[in-house]
Amino acid sequence: MDKKYKLWNYKYDFSEINLKNWKEVLKDTFKLNTRKIALLSMLFAIEILMTIISKVIMGLAIPMIVGVYTIEISFFVILIIYLCSNYIYASILSITAIWFRLLLGSEPVGLLSMMISDTAFLTIFAVLFFILKKFIFLKFKFKNQIKILIALICFAGLISMIGSGFISMLCNDKFIFEMYYLSDDGSGYWKMLLWVGFGVTLAKYSINILLFASTLKVLLILIKQSRV
């Protein structure tokens, strides 16, 4: 079969899947080789490093907001892992990195909340980005593909952060705050906490999407050259 790769010059992107090539697409997407394992290991190490930086340096620069929320800058590495591999591998490494924070003194309830938020964002982002690539990026020819990809990433990121924000609000309202022994006394503090959390979620993912988008051009070159 004459292969015509549309995004990468050496493999299928998952968004290129159809009834004829699905076996090859799944193989290209999920098969682990020495290069891919080495790359994922390196990126996971960078994620852990960024986690430590977020925990120590950012924790000192930006203390807990209203005693509950923090802003982390390590999630963009998970998006890089997603771009280099797939949603499943990115999710596994994301959850592993989140619970690694226990060794840095983070408390479990906050990590549970972070896991819900990050997993929700990554899931929505992966679905939206797949749809946008399949029905826009791969359907039409663009002079500047990098700019189009960045625009699609920003759009998918915007929808994902809003979705993740509302999911986090719902979880906070239903059980997360109760695990902090907080209660709604009718004073308005409960609702204020919920909306502050929504704002913090938007701020966190906005920063990480910008970091991810700013590195996209270099990432695409490195991925194509490394052929992972």
Curated annotation (Swiss-Prot):
It is a multi-pass membrane protein. Coiled coil: none annotated. It comes from the Bacteria. InterPro entries: Riboflavin_Transporter_RibV. The chain crosses the membrane at residues 37-57, 61-81, 87-107, 111-131, 148-168, 192-212. Induction: Expression is probably regulated by riboflavin, via an FMN riboswitch. One of its GO terms (cellular component) is plasma membrane. Probably transports riboflavin. NCBIfam families: MMSYN1_0877 (NF043064). This is Putative riboflavin transporter RibV. It comes from Mesoplasma florum (strain ATCC 33453 / NBRC 100688 / NCTC 11704 / L1). The lineage of its organism: Bacteria, Bacillati, Mycoplasmatota, Mollicutes, Entomoplasmatales.
